[in-house]
Amino acid sequence: MDLGLAGRRALVTGAGKGIGRSTVLALQAAGAHVVAVSRTQADLDSLVSECPGVETVCVDLADWEATEQALSSVGPVDLLVNNAAVALLQPFLEVTKEAFDMSFNVNLRAVIQVSQIVARGMIARGAPGAIVNVSSQASQRALANHSVYCSTKGALDMLTKMMALELGPHKIRVNAVNPTVVMTSMGRTNWSDPHKAKVMLDRIPLGKFAEVENVVDAILFLLSHRSNMTTGSTLPVDGGFLVT
């Protein structure tokens, strides 16, 4: 199926590992020119080795001024994937200011900032575009020790709807994907304990965690012209977790 991504210019944050890295590879394979953003230069270097032709930007999205400087001259962007995130897990009574600030700065504030930069460019060019925010099932369900993380993702879902409302008249679509646990290398490590995994799997009707390609496929669909009447949606990639 042709997704119409060839020749489009895409920017992906959190591109060094996991979902972001796989999204970069899939977009380039579909013919897009990709700008990969990560705070870790070594990850970007290995990405370029694996995927020559990818443009890279190394910046910590928690730093507003550095992000503005790094992305202000990134050039025209047609497609944006806001994937960068942190998950600092603490019991509610032990939540620290540092964890709160870092989580909201990366998971929400950076989405606003990067999307503003990209959307302003689209509007100035009179060009349509698509933005996908990588959210989580944690936006809609309370999970132990996830007070701050769940809050950032709940806010991201509403931000997605607000962006869709205000950017729609400019022909810019905005959607979110909401995965369950994803079997990235980190996911496999964090959920390697069979007892811990069983507690979550018992709440998933399909009885399995998501693979990275499940999430990437959803992202590419929402970026593509195949979803050109879809905006403001939050698409679960969760095996049915949110229906339980």
Swiss-Prot record:
Organism domain of life: Eukaryota
Omega-N-methylarginine: residues carrying this PTM: R21
N-acetylmethionine: residues bearing it: M1
Topological relation to the membrane, as annotated: Peripheral membrane protein
GO biological process assignments: D-glucuronate catabolic process to D-xylulose 5-phosphate; D-xylose metabolic process; glucose metabolic process; NADP metabolic process; positive regulation of reactive oxygen species metabolic process; xylulose metabolic process
UniProt keyword RNA-binding, yes or no: no
Assigned keywords, A-Z: Acetylation, Carbohydrate metabolism, Cytoplasmic vesicle, Glucose metabolism, Membrane, Methylation, NADP, Oxidoreductase, Phosphoprotein, Xylose metabolism
SUPFAM superfamilies: NAD(P)-binding Rossmann-fold domains (SSF51735)
Family stated for the protein in its record: Belongs to the short-chain dehydrogenases/reductases (SDR) family.
Biological function: Catalyzes the NADPH-dependent reduction of several pentoses, tetroses, trioses, alpha-dicarbonyl compounds and L-xylulose. Participates in the uronate cycle of glucose metabolism. May play a role in the water absorption and cellular osmoregulation in the proximal renal tubules by producing xylitol, an osmolyte, thereby preventing osmolytic stress from occurring in the renal tubules.
PANTHER family: D-ERYTHRULOSE REDUCTASE (PTHR44252), L-XYLULOSE REDUCTASE (PTHR44252:SF2)
Name the record gives this protein: L-xylulose reductase
Source organism of this protein record: Mesocricetus auratus (Golden hamster)
Gene: DCXR
